[in-house]
Amino acid sequence: MKWFIPGSVPSSKNGRRWTGKYFIASKAVMNYRKKAKDYYAKYHDEFKAELAKHDLPAKISFEFIRGTRHKFDYINPAQTVQDDMVKFGWIEDDNAEFILPVFEQYIYDKENPGVWIEILNNEKENNNN
């Protein structure tokens, strides 16, 4: 089963702003999160039900559909998505105990950017002693 979160996924690391007391997310990240939150809420129960069928760490695939041809590092937008997965209760934490991220080759689609999220079978699920 796959879940699609629409929108051009920005990096939560780049563009952070200093308020004088702490860093806040960039406007791009704030706008993305505002638009994506309903999708995370909508798919929450479905994702959790599927996740319950897998041992931890869950092997989770991310396939980014980029709205521009700008170069990017997979880990930066993945961090945004993983932070949202924690925030909206999809996963308990995004550390190595809970998630093993896997990246698919990105796709360019100016009209339909977003990210496909899929829980994969972990070959080691039956070998954890």
Regions found by a protein language model. Name each.
Residues 1-129:
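Acidic, proline/glycine-enriched N-terminal capping motif
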